[in-house]
Amino acid sequence: MVYSQVLKGAEYMNIADQLEQHAHQELQHALTISRQIDYLGKMPSVTPKPVKVSEKARDTLRFDLDNENETIVNYQERIRQCEALGEFAMAEQIREILVQEQDHQIDLATALGEDVPDVSRLRGARKR
């Protein structure tokens, strides 16, 4: 939600609206994951990552894209873990979230005039 409120300038109005939609979707993702954690008999707890912001709209979009890339890698790993545990329905719910996260990634890369990042390199770096 923070990113959608700090972007200024006509060229960023479309992405600012999209970022506000992303924020609402992110809340739904958190609720879905919390329900799944509760289903597993655990207590959901979250320590949010600090939000990086900048006076420069382009930098703000870059920070958000970097966060989306990391989130995608994390969800891909959660899907593999769920499947390894035989929690196939849970993996499917996370896949649905992943589709939206990839849409967010596309929106941000497009706003930056870039190709969608290849997060497989991030995943490989985390395994080392």
Task: Enumerate the language-model features and the residues they cover.
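Iron-associated oxidoreductase/ferritin-like identity signal
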Residues: 1-128
